[in-house]
């Protein structure tokens, strides 16, 4: 089994070198593929002897076990890449994953907040407290830029230019983009940098823009808990929440106000336009609801 686990690490090293994938993606691949190896060894199989039927059985067992289709799709993607790698490296003479059927995924629309709900969320932090002033600045930046939460918590002081009103973001695949901040976000960043950040650092010298209460880099999970806290204060239904709720609102509201789809794609850092197009469905659905509510013949 150790040999098969070592093959996984070799594969991940190759992915990192060739594709420059994010650490979160590599960690997810490691978890999924380690589970595959353990499952195979429990049945007396190895990476060298596994057949398509084995892998299809594994996927079927996960469906029967209640795993979501998205989880199975992610696992299938990991297995396909891995076994393609083993085939290219001539560890195997075939690729058993090539015969696997893909699970059908429902097209899920991003969870959407109205502009009024976003405004309530942005007003929830108490700005006279340094910790909540930090959160206020983070929420404003998130809504102004549409950053991923991982991108937001990873920002450093050198990533922002208040004079130019832009933020430099290193996104997926280490792709760099510049995103405008807007007046509100710049104002709250300036206020936070003057009155909030020095208190949080308490003499500690780090380059992180939004440090935790312990003067360390904040985790995505911590910020997600903060968002949920403010959503409760703002009276927002928890079913409308996700860690990327303000990123989704940013995209949908831009499209509602007439922004070009390709501009939104660039701001979000999507490599594929089809990923951005799902927000047009959210915007269209919002228009349909408004039409039904307010048109006299709807």
Language-model region placement:
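Conserved catalytic core of the tyrosine transesterase superfamily
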Residues: 1-298
């Amino acid at each position: 089994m150790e040999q098969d686990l070592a093959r996984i690490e070799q594969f991940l090293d190759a992915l990192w070198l060739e594709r420059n994938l994010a650490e979160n993606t590599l960690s997810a691949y490691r978890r999924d593929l380690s589970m595959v190896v353990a499952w195979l060894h429990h049945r007396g199989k190895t990476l060298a002897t596994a057949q398509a039927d084995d892998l299809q059985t594994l996927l079927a067992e996960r469906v029967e076990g209640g795993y979501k289709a998205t989880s199975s799709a992610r696992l299938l993607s990991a297995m396909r890449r891995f076994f393609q790698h083993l085939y290219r490296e001539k560890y195997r003479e075939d690729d058993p994953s090539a015969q696997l059927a893909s699970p059908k995924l429902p097209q899920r629309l991003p969870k959407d907040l109205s502009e009024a709900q976003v405004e309530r969320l942005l007003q929830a932090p108490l700005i006279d407290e340094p910790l909540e002033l930090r959160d206020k600045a983070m929420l404003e930046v998130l809504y102004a830029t549409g950053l991923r939460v991982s991108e937001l918590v990873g920002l450093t002081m050198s990533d922002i230019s208040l004079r130019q009103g832009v933020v430099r973001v290193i996104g997926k695949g280490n792709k760099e983009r510049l995103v405008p901040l807007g007046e509100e976000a710049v104002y709250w960043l300036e206020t936070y940098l003057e009155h909030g950040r020095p208190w949080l650092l308490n003499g500690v010298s780090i380059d992180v823009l939004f440090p935790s209460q312990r003067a360390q880099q904040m985790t995505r999970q911590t910020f997600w808990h903060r968002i949920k806290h403010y959503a409760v204060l703002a009276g927002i239904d928890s079913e409308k929440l996700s860690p990327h709720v303000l990123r989704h609102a940013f995209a949908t509201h831009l499209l509602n106000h007439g922004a070009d789809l390709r501009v939104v794609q660039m701001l979000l850092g999507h490599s594929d336009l089809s990923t951005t197009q799902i927000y047009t469905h959210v915007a269209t659905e919002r228009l349909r609801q408004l039409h039904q509510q307010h048109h006299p013949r709807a």
